[in-house]
Structure formats: structure tokens, C-alpha cells
Amino acid sequence: MVDDPNKVWPTGLTIAESEELHKHVIDGSRIFVAIAIVAHFLAYVYSPWLH
């Protein structure tokens, strides 16, 4: 892995592979946050003790 200049230490991924993986992680995080916001809003609306 050290001999290959296209691979990035310590993952062994190329720059393009790491950018693609990063894009998927960020997209997944955005989806998770959107679901969490909806869930918190619904919990607030339907929980009488929060009002």
C-alpha cells in the first residue's frame, strides 16, 4: 500500500473512491437528520405532556 502513490494511507482507497464514499456518508447523514426532524416534530405534536 505504501508503494502505490494512488492509494491514501491508512484506508488504501484512492482519492476518487474516498470522495465517493464520503458523498454516500453525507447523503445518509442528511436522510437521517431529515427523519429525525420529522420524528421530533411528530413527537411534539402528539405528546400532550410536551405542550
Curated annotation (Swiss-Prot):
The chain crosses the membrane at residues 24-46. A bacteriochlorophyll binds at residues 22, 40. InterPro entries: Antenna_a/b, Antenna_beta_CS, Antenna_beta_dom_sf, LHB-1/5, Light-harvesting_complex. It is found in: Cell inner membrane. SUPFAM superfamilies: Light-harvesting complex subunits. It comes from the Bacteria. One of its GO terms (molecular function) is metal ion binding. Residues 1-23 are cytoplasmic. Residues 47-51 are periplasmic. GO terms for cellular component: plasma membrane; plasma membrane light-harvesting complex. This is Light-harvesting protein B-800-850 beta chain D. Antenna complexes are light-harvesting systems, which transfer the excitation energy to the reaction centers. It is a single-pass type II membrane protein. It comes from Rhodopseudomonas palustris (strain ATCC BAA-98 / CGA009). Keywords: Antenna complex, Bacteriochlorophyll, Cell inner membrane, Cell membrane, Chlorophyll, Chromophore, Light-harvesting polypeptide, Magnesium, Membrane, Metal-binding, Transmembrane, Transmembrane helix. Its main location: membrane. The core complex is formed by different alpha and beta chains, binding bacteriochlorophyll molecules, and arranged most probably in tetrameric structures disposed around the reaction center. The non-pigmented gamma chains may constitute additional components. Pfam families: LHC (PF00556).
